[in-house]
Amino acid sequence: MLVKMAIRNVFRHKRRTFLTVITMAVGLMFYIFFDSLFVGIDRMVVEGLVKYSDSSLVVVSKEYYENQKAYPLKKSIRDEEKIKRLAEGFPDIEGVAPRTQFLGELVYYGKSKYIVGTVISPERDEKVFEIKSSLKEGGFFSESGEDEALIGIDLARELGVQVGETITIMAQTKYETHNALDFVVKGLISTTVPSINEASLFLTYRGAEKLLDLEGSVTSLHIKVRWPKGESIPSYTKRVETIARSLQEKLPEYKVSSFMDIYGDFLLLMQQKKATTYIITFLILLIAAVGIVNTILMSVYERIKEIGVLMAMGFKPKEIRRLFLLEGIVIGIIGGLAGMVLGLVVDVWVIYSGINFAEMYSGMRASDIGMPIWGTLYGEWNIVAFLLSFGFGVLVSFVSTYFPARYASRLQVTECLRFV
């Protein structure tokens, strides 16, 4: 009986109930939207690191690891085949690729920029990284690849370099002597990792031999762990770190790092930045809570005489309190369901259409938007966010209704009946 009365009372004041429900629904919609968006950002960042930057696991010598920011070419890997064989013994490994990174300067007609160069073996690199599929203009390395280079698209735009033109790369060799060599720009790369687009250059081992005197030196081995579509980041991270620990036990003379070991602090910072958005969402829900309090209080004041009649008919204070609490819960359920529906609509849009940052910020570099992402950002489904939003909506309504309901239950019958 009380439930029927509560539902009837909620729909008696349609306009006020509608405004309260809409406020709550919009707040919950923003929560669902931002949750989907930030899970998508997390995935884009991690996928960018895995697909373009360092892959799932990186193996370097301990001497290299201790001075890795200087990219020391002398601290190379001595047991490449052994490490490759051990890595490929795991069922989830899709490929192992050698890389050698160096610091250099790209010079083009009087303009120059410091870059991080990466030396790759094209045929093996394709099994681990997606550099080839990220080509925006031009093509991949030819069979020899000796005098060819790939550079980031934003780097090319900054210096005015076109595909087919010649650039000069200046760098220190393995023996710490200065050298410079000309390369033809074979293609321009556009990835979801801003640092690659803005300051990276790729050479083949054959081409880098003349520039760096590598003599076949490989400073890092990058291992790709299979990542099935739909697997969450925490689940993937757990599998990768399990393999990393196992490899580290078998290779005590080397340092085995997962992508979380390398970028853990950066990813943690991204998590902390989410707090700002969630605070905004909380404020919206707080406004909704104030609206619910207002709705219930107005309902109490408008129905004081009715409350007196109910008490005269034998309703106890706790039943009056329960009636108004039920009204608040009904509003919360309606608002929660409306929020889930609106959240579903925006989720479908952001998951299947995405937000194209490249078009939105055309003419700008990826780093100019202040986020470590580029290209099209897609959201991710998170059923937990829908359930939490609904539960939070009902909880906020219940808490917001408590004090008005308590006030109504404490009214005296004589006071209520005299109220006009």
For every predicted segment, state its role:
Residues L297, K305-I351, L388:
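Transmembrane alpha-helical interface segments in multi-pass membrane proteins
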Residues M1-I32, K51, P317-K318, R322, ...:
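N-terminal Sec/SRP start-transfer signal
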Residues R99-F102, K111-I120, L135-G207:
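Hydrophobic secondary-structure segments that place a key small or acidic residue at a functional site
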Residues D35-V116, G139-G145:
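Hydrophobic, regular-secondary-structure patches
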Residues G375-V420:
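C-terminal membrane-exit region of the final transmembrane helix in multipass inner-membrane proteins
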Residues Y31-S36, K274-M313, I320-L325, S397, ...:
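A hydrophobic alpha-helix feature that marks transmembrane segments and, especially
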Residues A338-L388:
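Short helix-loop junctions at transmembrane helix boundaries
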Residues K51, T173-T277:
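Mechanotransmission and gating elements of multispan inner-membrane complexes involved in transport
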